[in-house]
């Protein structure tokens, strides 16, 4: 065998060995951090929110005045921070016109925002926390419908 061929065979064998070892490791149960008396029982986290008291106060009734109004629903999960997240649900399939009637020639669609939440761990490590992405509906908007012409 040439040096190049020998190197490729060794690389292949090394790769297979790594894959097998990683599958054996991943099949085992994850280990939790051991309890330690010097580890604090609670941790204080300071959240610094910029522009908290800005003068750009928004009207709180956008959900009623919109041409695509929505209702807010409480999403509560005690194992998550924040534990309460308010989510929007579009009231109509169509949009509200200037007369206050629903116009089904337009579509009311949700506006979604991805946020980060902290989730409390469960078995086998109940005292752990993990950061998760969550898709939240924050409002609704009015759009023109997608029309497919059949020829």
Swiss-Prot record:
InterPro entries in UniProt: Cystine-knot_cytokine, IL-17_chr, IL-17_fam
Positions annotated as glycosylated: 36, 53, 64
Residues annotated as signal peptide: 1-22
Main subcellular location of this protein, as a coarse class: secreted
Entry's Gene Ontology cellular component terms: extracellular space
Molecular function GO labels: cytokine activity
Family membership noted in the UniProt record: Belongs to the IL-17 family.
UniProt name for this protein: Viral interleukin-17
Lineage: Viruses, Duplodnaviria, Heunggongvirae, Peploviricota, Herviviricetes
């Amino acid at each position: 065998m040439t040096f190049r061929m020998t190197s490729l065979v060794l690389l292949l064998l090394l790769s297979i060995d790594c894959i097998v070892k990683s599958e054996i490791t991943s099949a085992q149960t994850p280990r939790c951090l051991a309890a330690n008396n010097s580890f604090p029982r609670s941790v204080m986290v300071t959240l610094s929110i910029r522009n908290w008291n800005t003068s750009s106060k928004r009207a709180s009734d956008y959900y009623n005045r919109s041409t695509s109004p929505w209702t807010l629903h409480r999403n509560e999960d005690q194992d998550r921070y924040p534990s309460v997240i308010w989510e929007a649900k579009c009231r109509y399939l169509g949009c509200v016109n200037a007369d206050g009637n629903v116009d089904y020639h337009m579509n009311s669609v949700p506006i979604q925002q991805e946020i980060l939440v902290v989730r409390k761990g469960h078995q086998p490590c109940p005292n752990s926390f993990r950061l998760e992405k969550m898709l939240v509906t924050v409002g609704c908007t009015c759009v023109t419908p997608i029309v497919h012409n059949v020829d």
